[in-house]
Amino acid sequence: MSFEVLEQLESKIQTAVDTITLLQMEVEELKEDKVKLETEANELRSQREELEQKSQQAQQEHAQWQERIRALLGKMDEVE
């Protein structure tokens, strides 16, 4: 009977070891996924910042053109 108990214990220990091994593999996969997601998030942040800079530059250029047009219209009014 004691041999049967040892076999059951061995089986339970093996199941626990297998479960731990699977969980360790899962943890490693999750760590890899985390690194990939962090990299992707950093790339997206960088792209967003670049787009914000381009947008700001376009707005500044737009404002400059509006000012030039106003100046030209003002000169045209003076001529008339």
Curated annotation (Swiss-Prot):
GO terms for cellular component: cytoplasm. GO terms for biological process: division septum assembly; FtsZ-dependent cytokinesis. Residues 3-80 form a coiled coil. InterPro entries: Cell_div_ZapB (IPR009252). Residues 41-53 have a biased composition (Basic and acidic residues). Keywords: Cell cycle, Cell division, Coiled coil, Cytoplasm, Septation. Residues 41-60 are annotated as: Disordered. It is found in: Cytoplasm. The keyword Cell cycle applies. It comes from the Bacteria. Homodimer. The ends of the coiled-coil dimer bind to each other, forming polymers. Interacts with FtsZ. Belongs to the ZapB family. Non-essential, abundant cell division factor that is required for proper Z-ring formation. It is recruited early to the divisome by direct interaction with FtsZ, stimulating Z-ring assembly and thereby promoting cell division earlier in the cell cycle. Its recruitment to the Z-ring requires functional FtsA or ZipA. This is Cell division protein ZapB. It comes from Vibrio campbellii (strain ATCC BAA-1116). The lineage of its organism: Bacteria, Pseudomonadati, Pseudomonadota, Gammaproteobacteria, Vibrionales. The gene is zapB.
